[in-house]
């Protein structure tokens, strides 16, 4: 594996996640619409959010921060699995790098823009709306104060309140009698953090992926967040949250139900902080399929693995894991964790094991010599339920050392509870199945 000495690679080239539910009828006539994705460290987001005090991107502290952030995602999943009513949602803002990916969205008529955090672990797309205590401005890194748009149904001519008797409202939501509108409350994992408001129908402005590009006003349902509490008052989600989960209130599901797209989306994470999310992406012709495990009360993107192959070592072992593009690394409990890391370590013969005086998030790291420009690691592939194999394209991360030189680490973290496949994996979800294919491009836009 070759690496340029003047770069810090987060996951080598491009990381992609495809997520979709394809309806039984033909989707050939459906369109594909997209939005740009911006990393927390990208120039676009840095214009809004101060990165002073954040760990240097690609450093060991940076990966430690992402791992800490992932632990919060895992805690959310455990709380959701144990819940018998409404799921506990993902947001927990105590860690500075928790929100790593954002998108600038345009909503309403006339259109206003909002910088929203992306989350595959929650469903509702909500914006601060007609609120007295929400965040209205930010101090940018340029020392300028930036005003944020606050959504209001009364100023958007295309808006319409969702009535209490609407099918969108459902039995799990309340009713605002004063407004005669469907009420909602989303409670997040962070202490006393929630958003409460009403549901509104409006338009989301999207661009097609065709050339020349066409602009489309896509009808959606969003949360008008009247009351924000906890970390949302500290600007943790800045200007709203864009849920990408499975529920029918999520934007991918709404676009499909309106007949605008196949019920799918792909997320491409580029190495330069700029990526792309495409709604209606149907993947590649050569992709392979594995069925989802949908027995949970609150379904997630959960699959079964039946075999692990690390280089020449093959182990028959069945376990389940959830795909989550919002999680940075892969977390496995035993015996799957030990099978992979011990087999990987036994086949690394050219580089010495890295021994740190303090505990690092990765247990298996190796030191590269000052003159070394490449390294070779054993191939890792997983056999999924149904028999198809998935080849992991980037099992390691490259980390610069403070005193000079590099180490590379197997980017698998030991879990004491659930298994999660992080965003170094590429999947597409189709007809209640996950589809996966090799990543062959580094260009997200």
Give the ranges of each region predicted by the language model:
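C-terminal transmembrane module of eukaryotic multi-pass membrane proteins
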Residues: 375-405, 410-428
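C-terminal reverse transcriptase regions that engage the nucleic-acid substrate
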Residues: 243-245
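Zymogen propeptides
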Residues: 2-220, 228-234, 252, 256-257, ...
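Short, solvent-exposed loop/turn segments enriched in Ser/Thr/Gly
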Residues: 197-201, 238, 317, 375-376
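Extended C-terminal subregions enriched in glycine
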Residues: 353-387
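Active-site beta-strand/loop microenvironment that shapes enzyme catalytic pockets
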Residues: 113-124, 311-344
